[in-house]
């Protein structure tokens, strides 16, 4: 298992570091490091601190901040930016944009799990300018072109 540097910015997390829930989990839960219960009204979005900072340091890695499926499905709480991208050289606190797309106010409790962090490999590329591409089977056929079923 690869190790990355983590900085605890909120002392309440000392005993609750992000961890994989099961041996097959891809995401590490991120928590809302807020002092009091916060009400997120329908249509509102708030930046929520997670109380941690990470430094991946390896340009071959990035981290994705993804929504928790239960919050979105049951309560309409999703990420305002849909997906967060943390570059390998970022060292600041991780924040989560929580957007209430539901119809009812949502009460966010201190230290509630609000998102997942997934570390992924990254390939940096360069571009070679060409006049034409070698023909592929699909070509330029886009949206819906591969069929419905």
From Swiss-Prot:
Belongs to the dUTPase family. Transmembrane segments: none annotated. GO terms for biological process: dUMP biosynthetic process; dUTP catabolic process. Its cofactor is Mg(2+). Gene3D superfamilies: 2.70.40.10. GO terms for molecular function: dUTP diphosphatase activity; magnesium ion binding. SUPFAM superfamilies: dUTPase-like (SSF51283). Pfam families: dUTPase (PF00692). Its EC number is 3.6.1.23. It comes from the Bacteria. Pathway: Pyrimidine metabolism; dUMP biosynthesis; dUMP from dCTP (dUTP route): step 2/2. It catalyses: dUTP + H2O = dUMP + diphosphate + H(+). HAMAP family: dUTPase_bact (MF_00116). Substrate binds at residues 68-70, 81, 85-87. The lineage of its organism: Bacteria, Pseudomonadati, Pseudomonadota, Betaproteobacteria, Nitrosomonadales. This enzyme is involved in nucleotide metabolism: it produces dUMP, the immediate precursor of thymidine nucleotides and it decreases the intracellular concentration of dUTP so that uracil cannot be incorporated into DNA. This is Deoxyuridine 5'-triphosphate nucleotidohydrolase. Keywords: Hydrolase, Magnesium, Metal-binding, Nucleotide metabolism.
